[in-house]
Amino acid sequence: RDLHSFPTRRSSDLWQEDTMKGKHKVIVSTKRLKYEFELRRNLTIIQGDSATGKTTLVDMIRDFVNNPTGTPVEVICDKKCHVVEGSLWKEQLSGISDCIVFIDEGNEFITTVDFADKIQKTDNYYVIVTREALPALPYSVDEIYGIRTSGRYGTLKQSYHEFYRIYGTDTYEDKVRSEEHTSELQSPFYLVCR
């Protein structure tokens, strides 16, 4: 077989696969709120409508990172969690290794090629909250999530937040029936083109 006949892959595709080191469960909670999710790949996107808890999740992690002993927020994870934001994102990112990095929407740098290049050279996992398309980043549609809430607001019960896939992984399979295939082979068009 000719070497040129094999499909080629972009380095960004390899980054998505090569740095997948396993699953990481993350639990972020207070007495009233709880987020529990599992990261399967190094890049996870959270999308959804306003008031679904996306920014609250990032705020809770920021509170924990900035003041771990003085906050009611508890973060349970096998990796350290960080929040990267603002105009100093490059400097923040350069000091983070083998961690889970959360980035909230409104940070314009997430849409840049510079950001995409930088994160592909790291060993971090990234959770990005955004409503925008991120064409420079190689992420899987299987890792785009929304946040669903169970429990009631306005009560003393803990509200439990879980991630759900926005794009399903179900595939549609339809077998070709032999009579359709046979009739197509006998059509005048097929006979002329044969």
Residue ranges with predicted function:
Residues 15-35, 155-170:
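N-terminal pre-Walker A segment at the start of P-loop NTPase domains
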Residues 89-113:
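Conserved P-loop NTPase "ATPase switch" module shared by AAA+ and STAND
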Residues 119-148:
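Sensor-1/coupling segment of RecA-like P-loop NTPase cores
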